[in-house]
Regions:
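Short, acidic loop-to-helix structural element flanking the phosphoryl-transfer center
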Residues: 24-40, 87-94, 146-151, 202-216, ...
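Non-catalytic pre-domain segments flanking phosphatase-related domains
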Residues: 1-13, 32, 39
């Protein structure tokens, strides 16, 4: 591990592929490391593409969780007061336009609005055909409310959208199509978090900008933040943090941008890396 000089007062943690195991579980080793760092005064901040209620109970119930960066940075919230510290959403009309274009592609899609997921009923029923990972499929089915037709639902509610997510049939198709998707929606933040999914957010909804906003709120220099991630939606915070740490199982672009590499998410990678920092007095 490289030598580091700064004490880290805020730890931003991606969940899927980073803090959680491939089975979407929080290990006891990772839990102990988080509580130990919190005991020394560090802010422990889940930083995820999920909305808060979509996080595993084992994470949500940690006594050290006050702040959360959710939906890829579309929202930063003080969970103690309920105050939303940062918000960046896709305007209602633009979200509908995006979905009209997605209707021409071989994908299923959904959206997050007001901290919950919504999906057209017929697309919801196709989930098992597009999502082979049983843990991801379970998350999709449990955290989406089927509606007769999503675009009509958005027109009716008039609400802005926190995130649009869609799935290609295969990972290979997603890799091939991602540059095309980024060119198709140049005014939006288009990235991939896992497997065969693509996620679309407002331009200001990214984990890096959200991390900076939270640091400003807390009066901390961003140089005193530590960020762990694995996916392309983590790249902005890996680059923004005082120290960005990529998981061994991470995307090559994320690993190339990181200041250090932690063991994989299936090997208590976050906890093991944090234990070293704790031993060095850097947390």
């Amino acid at each position: 591990m490289p030598e580091f000089e700064l004490p880290y007062r805020l730890i931003a943690l991606d969940l899927d592929g980073t803090l959680l195991t491939p089975q979407k579980e929080l290990t006891e080793g990772n839990r102990r490391a988080l509580l130990a760092a919190a005991g020394r005064g560090a802010h422990i901040v889940p930083t995820t593409g999920r909305f808060f209620e979509g996080m595993p109970e084992a994470v949500r119930s940690l006594p050290c969780i006050r702040y959360a960066i959710t939906i890829n940075g579309a929202q930063v919230q003080d969970r103690q007061t309920g105050e939303v510290l940062y918000r960046a959403e896709i305007p209602n009309r633009r979200a509908i336009e995006v979905m009209e274009q997605l209707d021409t592609l071989p994908v299923i899609y959904d959206c997050y609005m007001d901290n919950w997921g919504y999906m057209t009923e017929t697309l919801y029923a196709q989930g098992p055909a597009y999502i082979q990972d049983p843990h991801v499929l379970k998350m999709l089915l449990e955290l989406r409310k089927p509606v007769p037709e999503l675009k009509a639902f958005l027109r009716e509610t008039g609400r802005d959208v926190q995130k649009i997510q869609f799935f290609f049939p295969t990972v290979e198709e997603r890799i091939r199509r991602l540059p095309q998707m980024q060119a198709l929606f140049p005014d939006l933040n288009v990235c991939s978090a896992l497997g065969n999914n693509v996620e679309i957010n407002a331009p200001a909804a990214n984990k890096g900008d959200a991390l900076k906003a939270l640091c400003r709120h807390l009066g901390l220099p961003v140089s005193q933040s530590l960020a762990f991630g694995d996916g392309l939606n983590d790249l902005s915070m890996i680059q923004a943090a005082g120290l960005g740490v990529a998981m061994e199982n991470g995307d090559p672009a994320v690993k190339a941008a990181a200041g250090a590499i932690a063991p994989s998410c299936g090997e208590d990678g976050v906890g093991r890396f944090m234990e070293t920092l704790l031993e060095q007095g850097l947390l």
